[in-house]
Amino acid sequence: YGTRFPKNFRPEHISYRKEESPEELAVINYTSGTTGYSKGVMLPYRSLWSNVAYCHEMLPVRPGDHIVSMLPLGHVFGMVYDFLYGFSAGAHLYFLTRMPSPKIIAQSFSEIRPRIISCVPLIVEKIIKKDILPRIDNKIGKLLLRMPIVNDKIKADMRKKAMEVFGSNFDEIIIGGAPFNAEVERFLKQIGFPYTIAYGMTECGPIICYEDWTRFKPGSCGKAAPRMEVKILSS
């Protein structure tokens, strides 16, 4: 080692393999099959690059920020967003060592305080229904919500409590992978909680639509990502 690298190992010693074409196969990712039967999806470098580049353009992760990786890396969103994007952004990646139950996930948020969170709806729904909604889901709480001044204070308090449950350090929560509970979504919108809903599939590597939480419209899944062609067809 000392003979080959007399002045230590430096960036110029690194030689990455260069693909012959952006269309060259990068990974075969197995999926249950949004567009049909279960299959191995052949994703080219172009697809992975486009997704990672879009994350850099739209999401506020900076070197040293924390990301909790909850999805398995065999899941295309976990691979592209949590790993490839987080790694290339210089973030610190934290992997759960136990099955990701809502309790364990909430504990990890409190300890790690991630900058941005991506998860399936069920996680947000269970945490909100268990730790936040019971505080106002009673006769007194519902009565106070009808009083304008008190209503604003309650919403501010609920937002603060909800932020604390998820670590208090995040810019937004990106939700996707399944329909979001309408009751929970209405509540989060009422208290001004920073969430957004995105849409994608393995075949697209995976991001198709996304919008920043400040411009996100409830009931939607954002706008088409750059370099992505979206066509709406009738049934």
Where in the sequence are the language-model features?
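Conserved AMP-binding A3 loop
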Residues: 26-50
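Conserved AMP-binding/adenylation subdomain of ANL enzymes
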Residues: 49-66, 73-160, 194
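Conserved AMP-binding/adenylate-forming
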Residues: 117, 154-235
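Short, surface-exposed connector motifs at secondary-structure boundaries
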Residues: 37, 64-66, 90, 164-171
